[in-house]
Amino acid sequence: MSRRGTAEEKTAKSDPIYRNRLVNMLVNRILKHGKKSLAYQILYRAVKKIQQKTETNPLSVLRQAIRGVTPDIAVKARRVGGSTHQVPIEIGSTQGKALAIRWLLGASRKRPGRNMAFKLSSELVDAAKGSGDAIRKKEETHRMAEANRAFAHFR
């Protein structure tokens, strides 16, 4: 047994403008090469574009998009008796949000377009409406979990 104590789970800090933890989580995932100010610029421009497109509260659109993309269940590779099985596992809310943010950013990076702010805003609006690549990724994950339901006892 380890002699070291377990690390406390840190709570996500909130961003300076919107005072929102979700926004800060998104900024930290946009971040590349330590350029946090650029990540903030990208997100704030995307939020402005969402405001112009939908004419509603952009934070509610962001929340709705993340809620729509957050998976309830995922598959994890587990090696049993020489063969690898995709075992469905339930996902907690924090891990689900992190996955949703990762999928949203991945889908927006793949989109053709001018700049990241434009692509991110388009993906967020699409996800809030229930379409887009991130939603497709969630549905695909749920389908995989359903198909491998027989291996749930390997958990």
Curated annotation (Swiss-Prot):
PROSITE patterns: RIBOSOMAL_S7. Pfam families: Ribosomal_S7. It comes from the Eukaryota. GO terms for cellular component: chloroplast; small ribosomal subunit. HAMAP family: Ribosomal_uS7_B. PANTHER family: RIBOSOMAL PROTEIN S7 (PTHR11205). This is Small ribosomal subunit protein uS7c. It comes from Yucca glauca (Soapweed yucca). The lineage of its organism: Eukaryota, Viridiplantae, Streptophyta, Embryophyta, Tracheophyta.
